[in-house]
């Protein structure tokens, strides 16, 4: 998991659209902390700081420690609503991480040792089907990324979830199938060349070039010839 982020917050005393608009005019973003078998906690955070953390690129996959009222609450961002025109954050949801609990998260995959893949060396292309894996993880063991080794992979090979050794405390959220994460495919130029060869091999032969004995007794109209009665 990426290093935890710290986000100072203040309690939100009033709810409703009017109160939320007033907070936004003051440069604050209304938010809520929920989950963990506790009542939701309404808060508001500084807009500039929230934007800064969003710009890290890993905010939604980071533990965010929210400081409020002298306490620190470990959370995981679940949603940030943005204004449709300005893209400014309008509201944020944080899921409270209960001690000893588990949570479903999306964790990015990173492919390693591409230089050790014969297929990639020959010009093959890694076609990534899933850029993230849906995992069920222990709250204190959320991985920042999943490394996938492509050493020895040839063109035509596929990488399935069953091949991946997940970190301790993590398991796939999808358990009903051995889904594909990536495949190693031939470059488009090679595919086109192979396709042309297949077309040439499968071309129909001109009937005039076939000996009469091999034309199965069909006449010029394509009907089977019959002997005289």
Curated annotation (Swiss-Prot):
Q: Where is this region: Disordered?
A: 1-21, 187-229
GO BP annotation list: translation
Q: Which cysteines are joined by disulfide bonds?
A: none
InterPro entries associated with the record: Rbsml_bL25/Gln-tRNA_synth_N, Ribosomal_bL25/Gln-tRNA_synth, Ribosomal_bL25_b-dom, Ribosomal_bL25_C, Ribosomal_bL25_long, Ribosomal_L25_dom, Ribosomal_uL5_bac-type
Q: Compositional bias (Acidic residues) spans?
A: 196-207
As one GO molecular function, the record gives: structural constituent of ribosome
Q: What family does the entry list?
A: Belongs to the bacterial ribosomal protein bL25 family. CTC subfamily.
Give the quaternary structure: Part of the 50S ribosomal subunit; part of the 5S rRNA/L5/L18/L25 subcomplex. Contacts the 5S rRNA. Binds to the 5S rRNA independently of L5 and L18.
Its job: This is one of the proteins that binds to the 5S RNA in the ribosome where it forms part of the central protuberance.
Name of this protein: Large ribosomal subunit protein bL25
Q: Which species does this protein come from?
A: Erythrobacter litoralis (strain HTCC2594)
The gene coding this protein: rplY
């Amino acid at each position: 998991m990426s290093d935890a982020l710290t986000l100072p917050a203040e309690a939100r005393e009033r709810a409703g659209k009017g109160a939320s608009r007033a907070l936004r005019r003051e440069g604050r973003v209304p938010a809520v902390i929920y989950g963990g078998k506790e009542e939701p906690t309404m808060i508001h955070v500084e807009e500039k700081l929230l934007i800064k953390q969003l710009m890290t690129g890993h905010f939604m996959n980071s533990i965010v420690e929210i400081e409020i009222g002298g306490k620190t609450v470990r959370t995981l961002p679940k949603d940030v609503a943005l204004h449709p025109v300005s893209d400014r954050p309008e509201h944020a949801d944080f899921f409270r991480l209960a001690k000893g609990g588990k949570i479903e998260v999306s964790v990015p995959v990173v492919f390693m040792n591409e230089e050790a893949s014969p297929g990639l060396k020959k010009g093959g292309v890694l076609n990534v089907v899933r850029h993230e894996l849906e995992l069920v993880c222990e709250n204190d063991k959320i991985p920042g990324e999943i490394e996938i080794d492509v050493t020895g992979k040839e063109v035509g090979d596929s990488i399935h979830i069953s091949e991946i050794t997940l970190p301790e405390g993590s398991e796939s959220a999808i358990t009903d199938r051995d889904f594909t994460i990536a495949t190693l495919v031939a470059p488009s130029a090679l595919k086109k060349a192979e396709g042309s060869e297949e077309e040439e091999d499968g071309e129909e032969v001109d009937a005039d070039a076939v000996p009469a004995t091999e034309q199965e007794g069909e006449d010029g109209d394509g009907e089977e010839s019959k002997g005289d009665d």
